[in-house]
Amino acid sequence: MGRPSLAEQRRVEICRALQSCLIRNGSYEMTSVKDIAQEAGMAAGMLHHYFESKDDILLVTAEMVLLELQNRLDDLLHTRDAEERRAQLEALLEDNDQNRFFIMLQALGLAMPAVNEMLTAKHDELQEALAERLERRGMAPQQAVAEAGKLAYILWSAVTAPKGVQSDIARQMTADSLDELFPPQ
């Protein structure tokens, strides 16, 4: 796999800048294209060479962040060592910036159909992937779908609770649900 092009690198930098601005400003509406450009270290007019609009930046950023979340969840499910898995889960739940951004995405999804569709699709993909894994482990298809739905909901909910809001009981429930369906070694 080759190095990403300069244009791809700049698009990622702009997406990271949007993410930082949203977290700092606490709102998509309070974040301007000028804020994003300044955070990315470029002139506001340059953003239009990489994205058509602020909404376009948001959608690409959302896709990028949701892919990162999906990869972290995949890593978590593939980890068989109980201590390592618990550490990965804690790191995921402690990633306050990512979790705050994820919460903002869900709020934006209420007003922006494209964001809502993306979130729904990613949640469905997670649930389907979990169901497939459970079926490969010998669980009946209907039960696998039901259990995958529960675990997807628990995992999705866990990453939408900002630091300080997550209770120890909720964290333990998340870990227990994961271990029950995908036992560590």
Q: Model-predicted segments: where are they?
A:
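Amphipathic, non-transmembrane alpha-helical scaffold segments
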Residues: 7, 11, 62, 66, ...
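Helix-turn-helix
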Residues: 13, 17, 21-56, 60
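Solvent-exposed, amphipathic alpha-helical segments
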Residues: 17-25, 71-76, 105, 154-162
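Hydrophobic alpha-helical connector segments
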Residues: 60, 71-100, 136, 141, ...
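Hydrophobic/aromatic-rich alpha-helical bundle segments in the mid-to-C-terminal region
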Residues: 116-120, 124, 135-185
